[in-house]
Regions:
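N-terminal beta-rich core of secreted/periplasmic extracellular enzymes
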Residues: 2-153
Length: 153
């Protein structure tokens, strides 16, 4: 998703209007997964969700451990499994499905996919990464992101 220069300038002007307290408030969050709104500037709250393999959203606000029940969502294969196909169209289809689910749950930002090369077998997040091959990782991540963004997320 490309952001034009006018949008950047508008955002910079908005940040300049914010007090230090308002800036701190949006960084600290309203809930574990939600930013605070700033009514004075008509800034709405933004909902973020973890989930490169499926949307993770709780019915209520989660506690600091995230122990509330999650809403039902599709669980897709790991990025490594998808990358084994070398099929960018498949990556984009999965991204579209994730984007549709995110939009249906009022999720504004999906925190994924993870893009990193697998440098060590000891990395506990390797399942989130597509491949140790930077070319394949980049192509698959781009297709995934195109799919997600095509649904407005």
């Amino acid at each position: 998703m490309k952001v034009g220069w006018k949008t950047v300038m508008k955002q910079q002007k908005l940040v300049k209007k914010m007090t230090i307290e308002e800036k701190a408030a949006i960084l600290s969050g309203k809930t574990v997964w939600q930013t605070r709104e700033i009514d004075r500037l008509s800034m709405r709250s933004i909902f973020l969700s973890d989930g490169p393999h499926g949307i993770r959203k709780q019915a209520g606000s989660g506690d600091h451990l995230g122990l509330n029940a999650s809403l039902n969502a599709t669980c897709f294969p790991t990025a490594a499994t998808i990358a084994n196909s070398w099929n960018q169209d498949l990556g984009e289809e999965i991204g579209q499905a994730l984007g549709e689910e995110a939009a249906s749950m009022d999720v504004n930002i999906l925190l994924g996919p993870g893009l990193n090369i697998k440098r060590s077998p000891l990395c506990g997040r390797n399942f989130e990464y597509f491949s140790e091959d930077p070319y394949l990782s980049g192509k698959m991540a781009a297709s995934y992101i195109r799919g997600i963004q095509s649904k407005g997320v």
